[in-house]
A protein has these predicted regions:
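Local beta-strand/beta-hairpin segments that build beta-sheet-rich folds
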Residues: 148-150, 191-196, 293-299
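Residues that form or immediately flank small-molecule/cofactor binding pockets and catalytic motifs
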Residues: 160, 203, 266
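Hot-dog-fold acyl-thioester-processing enzymes
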Residues: 1-104, 164, 168-171, 175-181, ...
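Glycine-centered structural positions embedded in regular secondary structure
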Residues: 264, 298-302
Length: 303
């Protein structure tokens, strides 16, 4: 099956794949192309997806959103994430899924999306390139209602270690690919001082978010599995932090917007973290830090 671009294969799935099964598949040692490999030339697609209103309500409660008949932009990332994992766990994906770090995210909500609207979701990979700490790659997502694109997303992942042969990482290293390059980084200097709000995060937040999002990466689920993977305690999902920050701006954002974030230091659970935000010329900038504002966990902007 082929899509609009006749050169790109479309892998049509019967439904959203299991993230847990994809993670397990990605843990199996497989010979891969590595930084000098080739990305799969295909898109993964699910059509006619009916959204689960009860699951959305539970997701909204965990992330701090007001439950409405329209969905948060980050919810559409949650729905496309299983397609990302399916691609990254595939044998023809050049980087090993185990060890990939989600370092930045950009999403565009083109218009409000109703919870009752059926969706066509796609995901593909693009732009395998150097990062100052290894190799980075983009996973692209798209949500359509009929023929209308209502949401697009770009998640950037880092494989630490070897870079592509002959490649040089840009000075920025993280946000270099985005049209809004550098804007999220500028947030750190625009918002100074102590946080304007404190969030107390329970030790089981990772399990709560996993239950509503489907992201069952073991670093978020228990201290035992987190320690096996190099963390002293469980860590909060980066996309929970992203969603919680957008929820804190709820009621102040336009109907259509672009949100860009960088993920910095992981949040070890339980924790008390700080949130700060500013607005200038219609652009909201924000950051999530430790409680005194000295260490940054996430920085971002919305416009």
């Amino acid at each position: 099956m082929t899509g609009a671009n006749q050169d790109v294969e479309v892998e049509l799935l019967n439904g959203l794949p299991s993230v847990g099964a994809g993670i397990l598949r990605g843990l199996v040692p497989t010979r891969r192309g590595g930084p000098d490999g080739t990305l799969p030339d295909r898109r993964v697609m699910v059509t006619g997806l009916k959204q689960d209103a009860d699951r959305l309500a539970a997701y909204s409660r965990v992330c701090g959103f007001t439950v409405r008949d329209t969905v948060p932009a980050t919810w559409l990332h949650v729905l496309t994430f299983p397609l990302q994992v399916h691609l990254m766990a595939s044998r023809d994906f050049p980087l090993a899924l185990a060890g990939l770090v989600h370092i930045s995210n950009e999403m565009r909500l083109h218009r409000p999306v109703g919870v009752g609207e059926e969706l066509t979701l796609t995901s593909s990979s693009a732009d395998l390139r150097a990062h100052r700490s290894g190799t980075q790659v983009d996973l692209l997502g798209e949500a359509r209602v009929g023929d209308e694109v209502v949401w697009t997303g770009r998640s950037t992942y880092l494989a630490r270690g070897r870079k592509p042969s002959g490649a040089e990482a840009p000075d920025g290293g993280v946000q270099d690919r985005y049209e809004n390059a550098g804007e999220a980084s500028e947030t750190a200097t625009k918002i100074g001082g102590e946080p304007s709000a404190l969030w107390r995060l329970p030790g089981n937040l990772g399990r709560e978010y996993a239950a509503v999002s489907g992201d069952v990466n073991p670093i978020h689920l228990s201290a035992v599995t987190a320690k096996l993977l190099g963390f002293p305690r469980t860590i909060a999902h980066g996309m929970w932090s992203h969603a919680r920050a957008l929820a804190a701006l709820d009621g102040r954002l336009p109907e259509a917007y672009t949100a860009t974030v960088e993920f910095r230091k992981p949040i070890l659970l339980p924790a008390t973290v700080g949130f700060s935000a500013a607005v200038e010329g219609g652009r909201h900038t924000f950051r999530v830090t430790n409680k005194d504002g000295s260490k940054i966990h996430l920085i971002g902007s919305v416009a």
